[in-house]
UniProtKB/Swiss-Prot annotation:
Protein name: NADH-quinone oxidoreductase subunit I
InterPro entries named in the record: 4Fe4S_Fe-S-bd, 4Fe4S_Fe_S_CS, NADH_quinone_OxRdtase_chainI
EC number(s) recorded for this UniProt protein: 7.1.1.-
Source species of the chain: Rhodococcus jostii (strain RHA1)
Origin organism lineage: Bacteria, Bacillati, Actinomycetota, Actinomycetes, Mycobacteriales
Cofactor info, note text: Binds 2 [4Fe-4S] clusters per subunit.
Catalytic activity: a quinone + NADH + 5 H(+)(in) = a quinol + NAD(+) + 4 H(+)(out)
GO cellular component labels: plasma membrane
UniProt family annotation: Belongs to the complex I 23 kDa subunit family.
Gene: nuoI
Amino acid sequence: MTKFLGPIAGFGVTFSTMFKKSNTEFYPEEKVPTAPRYHGRHQLNRYADGLEKCIGCELCAWACPADAIYVEGADNTDEERFSPGERYGQVYQINYLRCIGCGLCIEACPTRALTMTNEYEMADDNRAGLIYEKDRLLAPLEPGMVESPHPMAPGATAEDYYRGTVTGGAAAAAQDESEVDDTAGDRP
């Protein structure tokens, strides 16, 4: 008798679950929003005027336990200013084949230049495509921002940038002012 009831009990479980609502998420077609603090792709942030926040200190690379970050710092000049400080990150790479998404690089950054976005779709069929260079990591320009290199806002110091008191309109005015100065020398 137990030989007969065993398979029926198994089919009973199958039949009872056949008519329940499934928990399947139809991922590529229906994307579920991520949590606000999700650790996704990294992003190099900018100040309100478009200058980069990265100062090329390499603390993020030193903090990375997977050795996934490579940074080369370079000195800013008055002609080519990429960040308000003395230095900027000339070369910045993150190897997502090695990155474990721990966020230690974010905690190590003294200027909050590096943050993580909610973007998680980074799959690629090419290994070289998973090494993100600076151009793919930089935050996009927002209205009022000017592409670096450009001079600091008139009268602003590095401390003003650090405290967040520099606005995007000040940089646009500085850029317009420098363009006027450049064309003034061409007149007879």
